[in-house]
Amino acid sequence: MTLLTQSSTWQALSAHTQNLPHMRELFATDAARFKNMSLSACGLFLDYSKNRATAETLELLFSLAKDSQLEAKIKAMFAGEIINTTEKRAVLHTALRSKASQSIIAEGQDIVLEVQQTLSKMQEFVETVTSGQWKGYTGKAITDIVSIGIGGSFLGPKVVSQALRPYWNQGLNCHFVANVDGTSISEKLKLLDSETTLFIMSSKSFGTQETLTNTLTAKAWFLAKGGLQSDVAKHFVAVTSNVTKATEFGIDANNIFPMWDWVGGRYSLWSAIGLPIALLVGMDNFRALLNGAHQMDEHFASAPLAENMPVIMGLLSLWYGNFFNAQSHVVLTYDHYLRGLPAYFQQLDMESNGKSVTLDGTDVDYSTGPVIWGGEGTNGQHAYHQLIHQGTALIPADFIMPLQSHNPIGVHHDQLASNCFGQTQALMQGRTFEEALAELANSSLTDEEKQLIAKHKVMPGNKPSNTLLMNKLTPETLGALIALYEHRTFVQGAIWDINSFDQWGVELGKNLGNDVLARISAEQDSSALDASSNGLINLYRQGAI
């Protein structure tokens, strides 16, 4: 057993699961439950009263956090200590949204100064493009941005841009390309005019396979449409650490934005990786996004555990995963603009906490990262909500909704809100056999049929959920929301004593993919591989089954 599972607090939590009343009873016996189990921070409101938790549960979870030195680990991250121990790196995405007056030293340098310089450079670039001063090779202004990246350099900008659609600058559109499948970029290029398109290539090394392949394809398309090599600088910019490769490609050194080792890809949207966001919504709104995240950083760093929103959410998720065998967690966004958030949080959480050894290399004997999934309401209510209500697996849920819509048409938002709140109530309350039978009392069914159908209509309830509200979806509230989930992820990793900031599984996949590519192109013999891989490669070479 690990030290974590041997601890008296862990054992107490395990025993405590046997003594919890149904949530129906918890609400019936405590009129102040909603008031006592909700809080506001940074423009967000969290109702966590619909959880399988009592005051005793929370005290035990806070004790577990203290036993795990959570507060010290939070301070270590903000101080720039080397908490990514396997790669010997600080973890300072929080510095990207810090105030200009702050000073944070990493690798012997004040990185806040570097961040502010980059923001100033971004501002100048954004203003040049959005004002129409930036001209393409035929003298026309830019109308379309194509952001080429993969992982965090793709998903973050795409999801945030999608969420902030009401704030987009008129006359500018953005397209996102990530997958190396040629269909992805081909379909995008069909829509574009080479004279008015600007490509942003985001890759720390300027050599990431998918990103480089797509960028080379974009360049070939540009040249085929009439652009010259000397025109590339007018239509391609880069976010990269490899200035040499970028300039060799044809990008002007003045149009290369930096990336830093102390920022992981899945935490990078706050950096120059967020350039597509800034182009679409303007730098004022981009800075508001950063400010919302900064407010959540300050809340996370200073609020007591019992009043700390990321801590509470992280502990409750851990509670279900480690003590109720919940293998997944669903994120349900009741706002069309936020429909991409489940995929973003999926990458954030699963790439961070999909680990099986502790920091000292000991195999864990407890579940770590759950499967994160979800979608937008109310669509999911006619699909996978059925599994959450009556399936055999426990699936904790997060419901996210703005109180005010950007598009207040008729009764749409009232119906959306009623569905959101109704779902959380149904999950908590369920339906007993007696209630189901009573609903059938006036039907034409026989008594025997009523008994049978009632059994099918029973829902156990006691299904946990959090509800996150904001007044309105703005750059600031979105920044706070994303930072909330970043820190929630950190909380769990800190208690599990794992490294939430490396991704060796991703690296292995990259390496093996490159190896297979060499064998597909016949540069290497594939017969040395396992029979399955060799057989698949041979089928691919044949081009037919």
From Swiss-Prot:
Chief site of localization: cytoplasm
Pathway involvement of the protein, from the record: Carbohydrate biosynthesis; gluconeogenesis; Carbohydrate degradation; glycolysis; D-glyceraldehyde 3-phosphate and glycerone phosphate from D-glucose: step 2/4
Residues passing through the membrane, by range: none
EC number: 5.3.1.9
Entries under Pfam families matching the protein: PGI (PF00342)
Keyword annotations of the record: Cytoplasm, Gluconeogenesis, Glycolysis, Isomerase
GO MF annotations, alphabetized: carbohydrate derivative binding; glucose-6-phosphate isomerase activity; monosaccharide binding
Subcellular location: Cytoplasm
Keyword Isomerase: yes
Residues in coiled coil: none
Stated family: Belongs to the GPI family.
Function recorded in the entry: Catalyzes the reversible isomerization of glucose-6-phosphate to fructose-6-phosphate.
Record protein name field: Glucose-6-phosphate isomerase
Species for this entry: Shewanella putrefaciens (strain CN-32 / ATCC BAA-453)
GN (gene name): pgi
